[in-house]
UniProtKB/Swiss-Prot annotation:
Role summary: Regulates membrane-cell wall junctions and localized cell wall deposition. Required for establishment of the Casparian strip membrane domain (CSD) and the subsequent formation of Casparian strips, a cell wall modification of the root endodermis that determines an apoplastic barrier between the intraorganismal apoplasm and the extraorganismal apoplasm and prevents lateral diffusion.
GO cellular component: plasma membrane
Protein name per the record: Casparian strip membrane protein 2
Keyword set, alphabetical order: Cell membrane, Cell wall biogenesis/degradation, Membrane, Transmembrane, Transmembrane helix
Family membership: Belongs to the Casparian strip membrane proteins (CASP) family.
Record's bilayer topology term: Multi-pass membrane protein
Quaternary structure (record): Homodimer and heterodimers.
Organism field: Erythranthe guttata
Coiled coil: none
Protein location: Cell membrane
A Pfam family this chain is assigned to: CASP_dom
Residue numbers spanned by region Disordered: 1-21
Keyword Magnesium applies: no
Amino acid sequence: MEKSEATTIEIGETSRESKGKTPLLAEVEQTARTAGSYRRGVAIFDLILRVSAATSALAATITMGTTEQTLPFFTQFFQFQASYDDLPAFTFFVIALSIVTGYLVLSVPFSVVCIAQPLAAVPRLLLIVCDTLTVTLATAAASSSAAIVYLAHNGNADANWLAICQQFGDFCQRVSGGGGGVVRGGGSAHIHGGALRSRPEETLTDGVDVIHYWDRRWCEI
């Protein structure tokens, strides 16, 4: 007796499967589209703040780096002059803010990539890490400069530090303006760093998380 050939029977999708697949796929696409739109808006906001922070940092660097005042009177042996490079804290300020300005300018293309690819996680993570380091450097420079500016205005009798701002008024005004510029720039950097880390409550972290989420939901059905 010859063996009968195996017969393959194709079974179509059940009505339950056909009804459940399309809404889930549509919901995945809608969630991913919502997340992409939100993150594109955040990336545009980040780009604006990044350019603003770079402008403030550049202005603060130029202001501090060109600060110099010479009093109109002098003696046979002394000339009364004040410059930013007379104080190491101000020199550190200029170097640190130059680094911050260069970083902010170089980070603009990465911010543009975040606008073009809003669900890309690597550029956003790189910007967050570098922004944190940049804010730390700018804060250190501003703090050290603020301490010297305070001593220049008020002096310190215990350290025999005389208040020089009564004589070098223009010098103190310029270094104070430079410190104010880095505070504004650091504030902008902190804001756009927080914007990159934020997300809406109704969306997931990125497109991969969206797919994994709906894969789990699909397995539970």
